[in-house]
Amino acid sequence: MKLKTVSLLALSMAFPFSMPSLAQGPGSQEGWNLSVGGGLLFAPSYLGDDAYQLSAVPNIQVTYGDDFFASVRGGVGYNAIKKGVWRAGPIAAYDFGRDEDGGGPFVIAGDDTDDLDGLGDVDGTIEVGGFLEYDTRPLNARIEIRQGLNGHEGLIGELSMRTGARLVVADQPVVIRVGPDVTLVDDGYNDTFFGVDAGQSAASGLDAFDADGGLLSYGLGSTVVVPFNDHVAAVTFLSYRRLAGDAADSSLVEERGSPDQVTAGFFLSYTF
């Protein structure tokens, strides 16, 4: 089975910025750094569903100073341009697709859905593109554009902004981040995940629907990071996103799901 698309999208909402960067100041991460951990993720069983599943999800991140970064969630990227508060460079990521049976390897609670029966699997996709980031600490804004080379073969644009503060609660440092997220996609992406052709309509019972591109979703994400020491950090997150445009109007979402998507979770991370 593949790790479902919703899990990666949910993690993207949860960790738009790395946990070490949240817990430490600029320039404190030199050389190679490895963070490993995992946690619990509560999210819709697929993007657009109204039923939820609980998953135990791993989180691995590798960085080299302020140059290279790689993670399961964020893909692999390189800060090719570093000028003051600006960062820009190439990025590659992998979309693990969507299983027709609605299952996943990390699900520990919640039933598999039959909403997707007759729609077929969505194959995994290699995505390549670039990003531009503005970081003044505590304000961080990021634009990322990726093109699918196979699988959905769609174009994705993600805009995110976070601001926050470092507090001390009961002698324990706490980092709070909150801000909006917007995702735009082209016709290919939306039609792959939300379109229903004549054959799929006959097999699934859903009305046929041709999904065009545009605004996929908008929402608000929040993250609370508690760095216990230089190595261990706990992360709690909560996000809400509202599907928009043809994604919200699709027969899959209107007849079997909901445009309102909530993600919550708790993670622990250890940085070597």
Predicted regions and their residues:
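Short glycine/proline- and aromatic-enriched beta-strand/turn motifs that initiate or cap beta-hairpins
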Residues: 22-76
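Outer-membrane pore/translocation modules
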Residues: 72-170, 175-177, 187-212, 243-247, ...
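C-terminal low-complexity, acidic/polar tails when present
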Residues: 209-228
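Predominantly the C-terminal beta-signal and adjacent terminal strand-loop region
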Residues: 227-272
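Outer-envelope beta-barrel architecture signal
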Residues: 28-36, 54-56, 66-68, 84-88, ...
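Residues on the lipid-exposed face of transmembrane beta-strands in outer-membrane beta-barrel proteins
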Residues: 38-40, 58-64, 76-80, 130-134, ...
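Cleavable N-terminal export/targeting peptides
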Residues: 1-30, 49, 247-250, 257
